[in-house]
Structures are given as C-alpha cells and as structure tokens.
Amino acid sequence: MPSDGRCWETLRALRNSSKGRLRYDREWLLRYEDVLEECMSLPKLSSYSGWVVDHILPNTSHHTQENAPSSDNSPSSGSASGLYQSTLKSPVRSSPQSPSPSTPSGTQSAHESPFTEPIALQSSRAIKVEGCIRMYELAHRMRGTEGLRQWQEEQERKVQALSEMASEQLKRFDELKELKLHKEFRDLQEVMEKSTREALGHQEKLKAEHRHRAKILNLKLREAEQQRVKQAEQEQLRKEEGQIRLRSLYTLQEEVLQLNQQLDASSQHKDLLNVDLAAFQTRGNQLCGLISGIIRTTLESGYPTAENQAEAERVLQEMRDLLSNLEQEITRASEMKKKDEEEARVKLQESQVQQGPGAPTKTSAPSPSLVGTQSEDLQVKVQDSTMQWYQQLQDASAKCVLAFEDLTSSKDSQIKKIKMDLQKAATIPVSQISTIAGSKLKEVFDKIHSLLSGKPVQSGGRSVCVTLNPQGLDFVQYKLAEKFVKQGEEEVASHHEAAFPIAVVASGIWMLHPKVGDLILAHLHKKCPYSVPFYPAFKEGMPLEDYQRMLGYQVTDSKVEQQDNFLKRMSGMIRLYAAIIQLQWPYGSRQEAHPHGLNHGWRWLAQILNMEPLSDVTATLLFDFLEVCGNALMKQYQVQFWKMILLIKEDYFPRIEAITSSGQMGSFIRLKQFLEKCLQRREIPVPKGFLTPSFWRS
C-alpha cells in the first residue's frame, strides 16, 4: 500500500535527521523526571489538521508518487527533498470568516471553493510528516478495527460453537437425567410393587393368624364363659350351702344356748344334793362363747365352711355330753343321797332295837352328804352387789329419761328450738376438749359447769340456760353424760391420748354434779357391759340380735359389726373409764375424795379376774385397762398389785390361751408381752398422753 511506503520513508528520514542521530541518556528519566513531566502534556494538532489530512495530503501523496524516481535505492531522499521544497500557506492565516473544516457546513463550503483565499501552509515536509503520522494512525486504527472485527467474529463463532456444544451437552444431560429418572421410577415402582406384594402376603398371613387367634379366642371365651357360669353356679351353690350352714349354725347355737339354760336350771339340785355343779356351768358358758366366736368369725369371712359346721356340731355334741354327764352326776348324787338316807334310817332302827322299847328316842340329824372337793373353776356371773349397783344406775338413767320426756316429745317449735340449743350447749364443749393447752381445757370446764349451775352461756351466738325449760337440767345432764361416753367410744378409740383430757373434765364435773357421774356410768355400762364387769346371759325366747346388742355389738339391718370395730369401741370406753378413776380436776379442792376413784378400778380388776375369760375380749380389755391405769394402781396398792399381776401371768394366762383361737392371738400376745416387760422392769410405765403439771400452766 502507498501509506506503508510513506511510513518507512518517514522513519528513515527521522533516523537520518540531526535529532535522530542524537544520543539519549537512559538515566536521564530518573534524574530529570520533573522536567519530563512538564513536557508530558499531550501534543495538540491544529484545528485544521483534519482538513489537511483529508484534502491536501492525498493530492501531495498522489503528486509524489507520480514524480517519484523508479529507483528503489533513493526513496528517502526524494521524500525529504519533496518535504523541504514544498511551501504552502498555513491554514492559520486564513480569514476568520472561513468556515471550520471540522463542521459539515464548513466542509461543504470548502468543496465548493477550497481556494477562495490564499492559505499559508507549513513546509511540505512537515505536512507530509504529519500526514504520514495521521495515515499511520489511521492505518493502524483500521488494522486494529479489522483485527477486532475478525476477533469478534472469531469469538462469536467460538461462542456459537460453545453454545451449540453446551446445548448439545444440555440435551445429553437432560436425556441422561430423564433416563436416570425413568430408571429410578422404574426401580421405585418395582420396589413398591414388591412391597405391595409383600404387604398383601403379610396381610393375608395376618388375616390367617387373626382368624386362627379369633378361633382360639372364641374357644377361650366360650371356655371362660362356661367356667364363669360354672363358677357362678358353684358360687351360688356355695352361697346356698353357706346360708344353709349359717342357718344350721344358728340352730346349733340356739340349741347350745337352750342346753346351757338347762345346765343353769340344774343348779337347783346343788343345794339339795350337796354337789358342786360349777364345773359344768363354766364349761357350758365356754361352749356358748366358742360357738358364738365361730359364728362371728364366719360372718366376718363370708359364709361358714363345712369345718365350721363340723366344729359347731362338735360343740353341740360336747354340750349334750356335758348335760348328759350332769344328769348322770345328779342321778348318781341322788342315788347316793337316797342310799345314805337309807343307811341312816337302818342304823337308827338298829340303835332303837338295841336300846329297847323303853329307852327314850333321840332325834338324830341326817348324816352329812359327801362334800365334793372345792372346784378351782371361776364363776361366770357377777356378784349380786355389783348387779344391784348396775341395776340401780340403769334405773336412774331410765328415770332421768322419763323426767324430760315432755321436752323431747313436744311438737311445739319453740320448745324444739330450746331443746336443740340445750343439746348443742351440752355437747359442743365436750367436742372441743383437746390437749392444746390447760387454759383451753379450763374454759371448756367452766362453760359446762356454768351451764349445769343454771347460768346462761353462749352457744352458737345465742344465750342458753337450763332454766328456759323446767326439764332442761335433766336433759342437759343426760346428753352431757351420753356425749362423754360417745367421745370415749369414738375419739378415744381412734386416739388413745384423748382419754386423759376428756376424763379429767368428766371427773371434775362428776365431783361438782354427782348425777352426771351416775349417768356417765349408766351409759358406759349399757354400751360396754364389760366395764361393770358383766357378761349378759342368753335368756330363753330372746332374739339373737337383742342378745348381741346386750353384749355390746352394733346390729344394723340384722348385720353385726365386725369384731375389730367392736373391740376398738370397747377399748376406747375402757380406756376412758380407766382414766376417769385416776384423775381429779386440778382446780378443785384437794381434800375432797374422788367420787369414783382407784378403789373401783381395783374392784373391777379383781372381779374380772374372778370370772371366766372371753375369747379376744378379756385380753384386749385387760391390756387397755392396765396400760392406762396400771401405773396409778401400782403406786396405790404396791405389793398387792404385783401379786395380782403374777396371778394374771401364772393362772389367768393359761385360761385365756385355752379359749383363744389361732386367729385371735394378737390381743393375748400383746397383753402377755406388756406384763412380762413390766415384771422384768418392776414398773408399769406412765401412759402416753398423761397430763403433766406443766400442761396446766400452758
């Protein structure tokens, strides 16, 4: 190309120029950097350089090519000479009115009249150099543009190829992914089908097992139902048999009691025949107690068994044998008496014959009958004096009830209200007795004493007085005594320590109001006949329920309370009685004797030891009485008391043990261990809950 030749010519010219032959210091840049910075500003071309490149340089280049020598050895010289010879006017000298060649309008006017005015140009060489530079830049720019265009095309082709390749790879990837998904789906479908088949097989197996188990279960249910029906039939049969046995036991008990009455009736021959029948009566009472214990045990456990019935029949047979032996003994005694009388009559006749008919006759007394050996058996009945005292107390209680009958049977609402107020005023303070403090106990005592003394007291926010009704005092005394005994039956039975605060208040009230004390004893003897001590006897024609009530049992709807509950109530009342006889109200006169003191406790202990023991009852009551009152009796009677304890251990324990069954040995063992421990220590311990002097200061 022509421009390439011009560039080389220019370079040669520059190399051969004076400046081109200059030597440059390479370190100068570091030393004179500041000078260079002043020259580093970008060179600026004339505003008409573009116009020169577009209009003048092409003509000059064309003219130079035409006049250029054909020889290749002098291109640079020709170029240089041309540059130096050319003299043009610079465009700077042009008129200011000439349009700028850079604008389109200026360019158009330049084409119309490019030489309207003479233009002062630089030298042709400078213009040529500048034009060569411009042409070189233009060619370089064009080459760069062409290279860039080719590079862009190449990159576009590569991008397109890469895009096509990526598209193909994406298609292959999608195909592989779809294939993989299809394979996974097929595998999953196969697994699901396999699982379904296995589940169906397992389900069929479970159904078969279920049918098999259902069949077995139905068989078991039928067997269980048959067993249940069989058991129900057996239970019904057992129940019927038990009821039959129970009725039979009642029949046997009734027959035993009747035979025992015959034994008692036979006692009339005791004085006539001079024979001791106490052994027969004692054994008869023991047999009655034994059959009663059998019935009581069977009622607690359900229905009587064949063994119970057999045992009751043995008791009946023994009672019959006992009665037969008694009759034989009476017959034998009667025959012996007749024989003795006959012998005495024969001897009398013989003596009369020997004396002769003239001899005076002597009236000889009949020969004494054979005196049997003193029986060592204990008595069953209580002493006559004790029974008279017991009956007097019951009569006084019944008379007191009759005294306030009008108050209790009245239909008048006002009288009913008075009765309720009096009953609350009498019973609520007793319920408030506790071991909290001595001062609280004194408040309760003062309130009860004030009520009995006719003073008004506050009860339920109202003022109450016994003078509100003429029969009020008798009613209050009766209800108060009843409440004291009821507290022993319930509160003391559950909490043994409660016996002492209740007893000390009752003792203080008894000392100031003796009638209340007699009513307390009457209620106590009625609910607990063993506090007399008294063992009620069965009378002919008496209903069995009435007899059980006389013994102290609670009978509700023909059902007798359980033995444990019965013993618990009896224990509570005996503990209250044992606490009353040893305690005195501390704020009363010390010189006054206790209205029912320890001498009555000694009497009770002596009398109960003179009576035949009852199974489970005697051992329980002895333990409760001695645990509460033993310490006071020991201090009062000392040696005599210990003799009594030794008597219990040596003589009375074997009697209790002989009549106690294996299931009722708990109370006997408890009493035995208690007395053995006391004998070992030579002391009866102070009962738990005993009121000490410090209590009354609280």
UniProtKB/Swiss-Prot annotation:
One biological process term from GO is: protein transport
**Where are the stretches annotated Disordered?**
62-119, 333-374
**Can you provide one Gene Ontology molecular function annotated for this UniProt record?**
phospholipid binding
Q: Where is the composition biased (Basic and acidic residues)?
A: 333-348
Where in or outside the cell it occurs: the entry states: Nucleus; Cytoplasm; Nucleus, Nuclear pore complex
Q: Where is the composition biased (Low complexity)?
A: 67-82
Q: Where is this region: Interaction with NUPL2?
A: 656-698
Please list the residue ranges that the record marks as compositionally biased, kind Polar residues: 349-374
**Positions of the UniProt region annotated as Interaction with NUP155:** 1-29
Q: Which InterPro entries match?
A: GLE1, GLE1-like_sf
- Gene Ontology annotations for the cellular component aspect, listed alphabetically: centriole; centrosome; ciliary basal body; cytoplasm; nuclear envelope; nuclear pore cytoplasmic filaments
Record's keyword terms, sorted: Coiled coil, Cytoplasm, mRNA transport, Nuclear pore complex, Nucleus, Phosphoprotein, Protein transport, Translocation, Transport
Q: Does the keyword rRNA processing apply?
A: no
Question: What superkingdom does the record give?
Answer: Eukaryota
Q: What task does this protein carry out?
A: Required for the export of mRNAs containing poly(A) tails from the nucleus into the cytoplasm. May be involved in the terminal step of the mRNA transport through the nuclear pore complex (NPC).
Name of the protein described by the UniProt record: mRNA export factor GLE1
Q: Could you tell me which species this protein originates from?
A: Rattus norvegicus (Rat)
Gene of this entry: Gle1
